[in-house]
Amino acid sequence: MKITKNILKAEFIKRPNRFQAYVKINEKIEMVHVPNTGRCKEILIPGSMVILREENNENRKTRYDLIAGYKGDMLINIDSQIPNKVVHEALMNLKIDILKEYTNIKREKTFGKSRFDFKLEKENGEIYYLEVKGVTLENDGLTMFPDAPTERGTKHILELIDVKNKGMGAGVLFLIQLNGVKKFTPHHKMDKNFGEALRLAKEKGVDILAYDCLVEESSISLNNPISIEI
């Protein structure tokens, strides 16, 4: 998918809280919005190059969103709104093999006490609930989720087990917001409960999927399935 708004580069200075950061644009320091509540400490390093998206919304305090950052030569998209859009585009274009037969695609649908990112349906009425998690944490080709504890994420995984137990299809797709990685695994040291829930979900028949992305400064799209170790 193309990022149609104005894109520009900046130097990262600091991130005083989850939602705000300071960057340098043409020698001027500017506060920007960070659309990601994760830590992103391996990406948002003082002096590193980041990518901004200009919003031009008079009702906002900040003019720009910080949507990506360079880790060496590797560009990592950190916009938490992007994964659902990328996966929706991939579903519409039949790029996810095990989900190609689900032609009715609905977004943000509730089941039980959770709202899942997608409710998919085949022509014969079979239903499948899909949850999407964006992944930005990488170390030597190994990607992990989460990069901060996530009770909400664990709740989603347990609800997917309930979906499966009720005879419907269920899956979680980890969208790795970078390219050229080797493997995905849950980040047990960061959130043991999430890792245990994911392992249980796999045992109960929930599909666990991971895909990397082709990431450029002004575009991002689904790329290839990635090996998973749980």
From Swiss-Prot:
Record-linked Pfam families: SfsA, SfsA_N
InterPro entries: SfsA, SfsA_C, SfsA_N
A single GO molecular function term of this UniProt record: DNA binding
Family designation: Belongs to the SfsA family.
Protein name as annotated: Sugar fermentation stimulation protein homolog
Organism: Clostridium botulinum (strain Hall / ATCC 3502 / NCTC 13319 / Type A)
Recorded name of the encoding gene: sfsA
